[in-house]
Amino acid sequence: MPGVIPSESNGLSRGSPSKKNRLSLKFFQKKETKRALDFTDSQENEEKTSEYKGSEIDQVVPAAQSSPINCEKRENLLPFVGLNNLGNTCYLNSILQVLYFCPGFKSGVKHLFNIISRKKEALKDEANQKDKGNCKEDSLASYELICSLQSLIISVEQLQASFLLNPEKYTDELATQPRRLLNTLRELNPMYEGYLQHDAQEVLQCILGNIQETCQLLKKEEVKNVEDLSTKVEEYQKEEMSDNNSMEMDNMRHSEDYKEKLSKGNGKRKSDAEFGNMKKKVKISKEHQSSEENQRQTRSKRKAAGDTLEISHKIIPKHISENESTRPSQRKSKVKINWLKSAAKQPSILSKFCSMGKIATNQGSKGHCKENEYDLEEDLGKYENDNTTNDCELESPGNNDMPVHVNEVKPINKGAEQIGFELVEKLFQGQLVLRTRCLECESLTERREDFQDISVPVQEDELSKVEENSEISPEPKTEMKTLRWAISQFASVERIVGEDKYFCENCHHYTEAERSLLFDKMPEVITIHLKCFAASGLEFDCYGGGLSKINTPLLTPLKLSLEEWSTKPTNDSYGLFAVVMHSGITISSGHYTASVKVTDLNSLELDKENFVIDQTCEIGKPEPLNEEEVRGVVENYDNEEVSIRVSGNNQPSKVLNKKNVEAIGLLGGQKSKADYELYNKASNPDKVASTALPENRNSETNNTNGTDESDSNKESSDQTGINISGFENKISYVVQSLKEYEGKWLLFDDSEVKVTEEKDFLNSLSPSTSPTSTPYLLFYKKL
């Protein structure tokens, strides 16, 4: 190689293999450079296309186009609060909206919450006891569902009231977050952990079942407390009877001493004046002593009662004054507790004197005299209503000359308590009767079962389609099935034959029988579950779950009567007030919405506490979320939900600005902005604390002198506290604003609330075709 380099001959240059290598290297280098040039050209082209696309996007979707959407939202914003979707929680939001508008549910939850708040205070006092630690944790976990429901109800009512008073504060949407209730459900049932889609009927049964268990737990504790109270009352009565017996003995002793004095002064014997049967004071001589003794015996037998009445005027005040001087505190505590005595027991001397009205008590204001009274009244105050305590006539310390009233022990009024404890039983729970009739001996056997919902089919079974006999269905076969047909399938007469024969106790062998299902007790609200999901015959289900959707339409009436399937004749009729719709293909996918009819607004009673934003309630007040909690919550969303990260380090892009976030679609067409922005607006006390009517503001400013100082003083007074007239004006304004929606149907799609016409609602309820959105749960209330 060193000899080849300096050579300049043409032959060597032509036959040199190194020259070919150089050419080959140059060839590869040209290819690489060409690729590099092509790559740079493509980058330039991409930059040009990106610039072009960016300009095209800016022209097609300008930032100014989002403002009409906001204006349209502001005009169409309704005074009804929606619920934010927290990650596939449409099944929970639809059920909560129905329960919120269910008649009697909110008042029952509030009553239970008041009982639980008192129980929590009692449990805090017993926190140091180790034996009852597990019971406390279980009870507090079951109590938390009621507290979460009450917290959600308060937040919804407060948000609704603040919107009606200041609608300009809410421009985007009116919704709150059921996060506390969702966390409580996850603690009670781990099935709801995560962000999977669940069945709306299952979550309804879970909520009602836990409420029922809580009511039973409270009822057991109430019965136990009443038993403890009755034992205390019995102990007090025993002590009182023993004290009364001691008082009787003292009275006997004092009367004997007095009789001895009289007998000594008159020269009579002690036996002549026993047990109060004393004779008149007459002067007798020693000569007629024997004849007078016989007269005294006959007269004492005839005038025993009369002499007692005459001498009682002289003896009783002396004994009472002596008793007051010797034992004042003991006597006063006995008199105060006399209203607990039973009149069926043997009356004592003190009760006789009280019944005659001869005793006038002198009740002082000493504190140590009332210790027993206060202890008993505190125990009774926990379990009695105010009406029961008012009936008992206890004397005030200031009355010195009032007679003592001895009353019987009155039973504790537990009517309101029982209604609160039977919230689920009264509203949602009915009773079915399963009758089985033997076809040989015609004997009947009945079995009763409780129900909270009725599961009815939406189409005929395949076996019934094959068989042409339609003995089960009372109606002829039609293409469009009705709800009455579905209920008749539920309450149909079933004939037990073949291998499934019935063992009759009278016949002592297996016989053919007929079995029917009838309604014996009907609740206030009937929940009808339409069996829209069936096991799919496909071996592989791409959607998962294994339950496919049946989109067969079912004619659903607005009014319903179950007299045909009842055990006894009844005139009760039910009206449809809520429907939970499901749109989708399988049970593990799709979206739930709720349609509710707004009724009974004339009898609407709003809580005045919801108009006071600066509340100090710790248990029932909804807890606002700070920025850190919102970060953790939003980041935990699954892939199906749109996650929005709020952080100071990560700057948001120009394309995803605040206005475009509002148009991001969530589950089921939900168009909701970020939860943290909405909650900061809803939970801002400064904006809501200054809520007042425009008319009230004008009237208040007209009464002032027109100075800025008076205006500032009035604004500060409005923020610190509002007078009673302001409360009444606000409540009347809110009620009048809500009355506009009387009888209208509202569609709750998570955070969105819309008004639907009755015609459109009926078309969606009973469609002519087979749509993907069908009714799933029907709620009828008693008219």
Swiss-Prot record:
Main location (coarse class) = nucleus
Q: Spell out which residues are annotated as carrying Phosphoserine.
A: 16, 42, 67, 473, 766
Q: Where is the composition biased (Polar residues)?
A: 7-16
**GO biological process entries:** DNA repair; monoubiquitinated protein deubiquitination; protein deubiquitination; proteolysis; regulation of DNA repair; regulation of protein stability; response to UV
This enzyme's EC code(s):
3.4.19.12
Annotated localization: Nucleus
What does the record give as the active site?
90 (nucleophile), 591 (proton acceptor)
According to UniProt, the name of this protein is Ubiquitin carboxyl-terminal hydrolase 1
Catalysed reaction, written as an equation: Thiol-dependent hydrolysis of ester, thioester, amide, peptide and isopeptide bonds formed by the C-terminal Gly of ubiquitin (a 76-residue protein attached to proteins as an intracellular targeting signal)
Looking at the record, which segments are called Disordered?
Answer: 1-22, 34-55, 234-311, 685-722
Regarding how it is modified after translation, the entry says: Autocatalytic cleavage of USP1 following UV irradiation inactivates it, leading to an increase in ubiquitinated PCNA, recruitment of POLH and translesion synthesis.
What quaternary arrangement does the UniProt entry report?
Answer: Interacts with FANCD2 and PCNA. Interacts with WDR48. Interacts with ATAD5; the interaction regulates USP1-mediated PCNA deubiquitination.
Q: Where is this site: Cleavage?
A: 669-670
Q: Which family does it belong to?
A: Belongs to the peptidase C19 family.
Q: List the GO cellular component terms.
A: cytosol; nucleus
